[in-house]
C-alpha cells in the first residue's frame, strides 16, 4: 500500500512539474494562434470595406492626428493608460472591426506579427502591442511619430522578447487599412532609465518633416529597470517580401522559439526511462524475493 501511494505521489509531482514547465510554451502558442486570428479578422474586415469607407477612415485618422502639435508623453509608457476609452474619439478612429485593433506590426527578422491595439493598458500589453495614446496614430505622414509598446519576457507570450536582435538598417512593417508602411531602423536607445522622463520625452517627440515609429519595451530581459527604444524612419514600400529568413535561419529560430518544448520532451523521456527501469528493477526484486521465500519453505 505504501509503495502504491509513493508511486501515486511521484506521478502527481511529475505531472505538476510537467505542467509548470509546459505552461510558457503552451500559452505562447495559444497567444500566437490568437494573434493570427485577430489579424485574419482585421484583414477580413478591411477587405469588406468599400472605397468610400477607406477614404472616410483615412480622413478621420488624419484629422485626429492634425490636432497633435507634439506628442503628449508624461513619464513611462507602461501602465500609463488604464482609463476606459470606449466612449472617446480616440477609440473610434482606426477601429474597423470594433475590437480595438488598429492594424498589425510585422518584423521579419524576429518572425513576429502582432496586432496593434488602442492604448497601453496592462490588459492590452499582456497579449499584444499597444499604441500610446497621445502620440501620432500609426498611419504615417510628415511630422508624425507613433509609439508602439509591448512587454518582453512574459511567460504567456513572447511579444517583443527578441526585439533586442534588431540592428540599424533592419526593416519592420505596419499594416493599417489598405496600406503597408515600411520603416527602417535608424536609432536604438538600449538602456534608458524608466524614470528618466526627460530623455524618454525627447526621444519620442515628433521631428519636423519626419515620419517615424518607435517600438518601446522593457530591458534588461527579466529585470525591466530600463527601457529599450527602437526607432524606424519611413522608407518607400515597393511590395518587397517581408520574409528575410533563409531555411537555416528559420530552423535556428524554431529551435530558439521552442527550446522549452524540447527541454520538456527531454525531461519527459528521461523520467519515462527512469520509471521503466524502476518498474523492471522492482519486478526483478519481487521475483528474487519470491524464489527466496520458496526456498525457505522447502528448507
Per-range role (PLM):
Residues 2, 6-7, 20-38, 117, ...:
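Extracytoplasmic/periplasmic soluble domains downstream of a signal peptide or transmembrane helix
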Residues 6-14:
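Alpha-helical transmembrane segments of integral membrane proteins
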Residues 14-17, 60:
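Hydrophobic alpha-helical transmembrane segments of multi-pass integral membrane proteins
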Residues 29-96:
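Juxtamembrane "stalk/linker" segments
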Residues 90-137:
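Extended boundary segments
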Residues 295-299:
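Solvent-exposed, low-complexity, intrinsically disordered
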